[in-house]
Amino acid sequence: MPKRQELIRNFCIIAHIDHGKSTLADRLIEFTGALSERELKEQVLDQMELERERGITIKAQAVKLTYKAKDGNTYYLNLIDTPGHVDFTYEVSRSLAACEGALLVVDASQGIEAQTLANVYLAMEHDLELIPVVNKIDLPNAEPERVLKEIEDVIGLDTSEAILASAKTGQGIEEVLEAIVKRIPPPRGDEEKPLKALIFDSHYDPYKGVIAYIRLVDGFIKPGMKIKMMSNDKEFEVTEVGIFKPYLTPVEGLWAGEVGFIAAGIKNVRDCRVGDTITSAENPAKEPLPGYKQVKPMVFCGLYPVESNQYEDLRDALEKLKLNDASLTFEPETSVALGFGFRCGFLGLLHMEIIQERLEREYGLNLITTAPNVVYRVVQTNGEVLEIDNPAKLPPAGKIDHIEEPYVKATIMVPKEFVGNIMDLCIERRGVFINMEYLSENRVMLTYDLPLAEIIYDFFDQLKSRSKGYASLDYEFIGYRPGDLVKMDILIAGEPVDALSIIVHEDKAYYRGRQLVEKLRELIPRHLFEIPIQAAIGSRVIARETVKALRKDVLAKCYGGDVTRKKKLLEKQKEGKKRMKQIGRVEIPQEAFMAVLKIDNNK
């Protein structure tokens, strides 16, 4: 009888968005009979309504499969599902740390994409055994030979044992399972050593508290044990231990090498950090597990409730989301224009959109968001360095020596006929050309250094539209560089509106200011007085538009007449003015705050 550990395989699936990762997971679950026919729905592991709707995987999930291999042994396969989108790289790296191997899924018609490559490099850092799987070979335009050659040339993997599969028709699924058993090594761990377990995810259950998803490296864990978190030394008693099928199923205990979950009455999310190491309180391990780094948010924006009495609800909702999402940060802030709200930090634009949608959908909140910002470094004349995530906090121009902005290294893969369009786009966005490499006769990999601020507006949309949807993008943060940046204020009726301030590059300031005031003129409703809208840098106004006044002579049709009649009309007019939601004296609709995002950034 082989040892328990030798029958365990922990693996994940790496793929670019839409290469069929979740469908492949469905087929593996179906083939091994982990779920009954009734429970099988498409994309079983994408349990969030939003994930199913957008067809993307956001949260990492896990499931335990039982597979009787051709060698007669029954193996336990732990599949840890990972997201493919660039914003969720931290989810991927945590899932990889819990595995010994990975299926590298590549679409037979699309070939290697930018994020496939990024995730492969992550997997190689974790020394994972990679099994190439060419998926979607049932498509009429599939070119498996070309894709296999790409995998060999670009990634340098031997594809002689690559598997051709179709997750849709179920072809090649058994070969995939056999390859997992044969080629992925079993976990190495010692049940006798003190407990060491990696938390790779968590979610909050209103009855049980925080449920931590863990991969045991050494030792064992059972209900009733006292455990300790190694980052903050907090102690808890385990109340429940279980595995994923993919629904949570309690078991008697977990041993080294296994993947499962624990509940320990943890009420505060901060005590259960993803990436932390759990150990036993009586017999603690000396060293925590390596490889966890605190994720830093890259994009910030303000979230404000439309009704000010929802402020507490918004705080509760953010606290709950943070339980599931280690990378979300938030702190309270106030704005003259919008009242009380929160400054939230996200990994990228998709992450921001999803959090916002979850707040509105799952918690029924009505929100106003301000324009997204990146974190700027401001070096003051006295040598002090400030990190600014909100343009309103920028010190006066006289105190600033220079401003530095974050840059990313962007890798763009694109068919050769669109290379010109994409290079134009990168130049418009102040990109610095680094490299261009032909992956095959008709696919090119471009590398640019770009300011992050230029990517977070609509770079991705533009990239897709200029390449007819064929380009794919991956980016990583490379550091700060000085730039000619200025703060642009928007004044409405002479009052600066803090929520509309943006930090822009000097060359684009006039153009952006011009566009923004024109857009605001369309969006701000006409009032009974003239409203000037100005864009200003410091005290210099660079663009101005005026919202014309509505006709206000309510007494014009009275021609003499009784004074009470005139009074009635004047009173009525007064009532109307009261009804306006005021900022200073002007009602600014929510669309106006979003206008900052929608400006065409191309000139």
Curated annotation (Swiss-Prot):
Keywords: Cell membrane, GTP-binding, Hydrolase, Membrane, Nucleotide-binding, Protein biosynthesis. Its main location: membrane. One of its GO terms (biological process) is positive regulation of translation. It holds the Pfam family LepA_C. One of its GO terms (molecular function) is ribosome binding. The keyword Cell membrane applies. Its EC number is 3.6.5.n1. This is Elongation factor 4. It comes from Carboxydothermus hydrogenoformans (strain ATCC BAA-161 / DSM 6008 / Z-2901).
